[in-house]
Design a protein with these regions (language model features):
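N-terminal alpha-helical "arm" segments
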Residues: 1-29
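Residue-level signal for secondary-structure boundary elements
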Residues: 22-34, 45, 118, 125, ...
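Flexible, active-site-adjacent loop/turn segments at secondary-structure boundaries
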Residues: 79-84, 94-95, 135, 143, ...
Length: 304
């Protein structure tokens, strides 16, 4: 365990003058992860499993007098969420608390502690997308979130742009066409609605141009911008500051069992004193897992 912070570590604060002390706590943006991941309550178990089912193909014609055809559904794959505990703590000596009371040092570091837990959640959520093209991070179906070969009954489907490209009018339109041609686990056409762009900070202005320009971006023609005129991506762009690729981008759809944060135990804050030293210990923990079930929730490209 790390040693408690002592008054000697904060000499400029506890000496008998009122210092102007910058507490190091910055304002933070609203939660970014919640724009992309839906929080759900986890079940009271060590892990949570979601079976992904497949149904039936198209119904065949039945000539007069012929018996009806039977088909079987089943489980295509299982997605398992394993709950993990995340936490951090700090300790303060009683002397430091007493002599540093003009900046309420316990409250200051409690805010730092809260920001550390928020940062963990943001990093874990962003890393689901940072590893979306990496075969070392498979989903329940055995391939990454973004893949050209998601297995389904009698074939595969792709949620990756056929030709890797940076964010542009053309690449965005091609991805939206791909979403329009989405199929279910039996290969039947389905209705997926593209909800929003997901981009790194370097693409925020390009995303704004593509989503809000009345005319087609990047050329001198007087063509309308079909993304805007049709009313696609009506939730705009979600910008995640912790995305590591400056060129990758994604389109999130309304697939119902998509990007999830399953909360097993919400944030718990505890404080206790040490009888022998009079130090105070502060701890915060929470337990959850973040990931995805249906990869149709995201279509993407790593860019070039």
């Amino acid at each position: 365990m790390a040693a408690p912070m002592r008054s000697t570590d904060f000499r400029s604060i506890v000496e008998p003058i009122l210092n102007e002390c910058f507490d190091g706590v910055y304002d933070q943006r609203a939660d970014e992860w919640s724009r992309v991941f839906r929080e759900e309550d986890g079940i009271p178990r060590n892990y949570h499993e979601e079976p992904v089912l497949y149904g039936f193909g198209a119904a065949p014609q039945l000539p007069d007098g012929t018996p009806v055809t039977y088909q079987q559904g089943g489980v295509l794959f299982l997605k398992r969420y394993v709950y993990k505990v995340y936490g951090l703590a700090f300790a303060l000596t009683k002397v430091l608390v007493e002599d540093g009371d003009h900046i309420r040092i316990g409250q200051v570091y409690a805010r730092h502690l809260a920001q550390s837990l928020v940062e963990t959640k943001e990093l874990l959520s962003a890393n689901v997308l940072n590893t979306a093209f990496n075969t070392s991070y498979p989903g329940g179906d055995g391939v990454p979130l973004i893949s050209t070969a998601h297995p389904i009954v009698n074939g595969t489907f792709s949620n990756q742009l056929a030709t890797a490209a940076n964010l542009s009018q053309t690449s965005l339109e091609q991805m939206l066409i791909q979403i329009r041609n989405a199929v279910d686990n039996n290969g039947k056409k389905i209705r997926l609605v593209p909800r929003q762009l997901v981009v790194a900070p370097g693409n925020i202005f390009q995303a704004e141009v593509l989503l809000k320009s009345v005319l087609r971006a990047g050329n001198a023609n007087n063509d309308i911008n079909p993304v805007k005129s049709i009313g696609l991506l009506d939730e705009g762009a979600a910008v995640l500051s912790r995305l590591t690729s400056p060129t990758a981008f994604w389109v999130q759809t309304d697939a119902p069992e998509g990007m999830k944060l399953l909360m097993r135990r919400r944030l718990e804050k505890t404080m206790e004193g040490d009888f022998e030293t009079d130090s105070m210990r502060y701890k915060a923990t929470e337990r959850y897992d973040v990931g995805f079930t249906d990869p149709r929730a995201m279509y993407g490209t790593p860019g070039v």
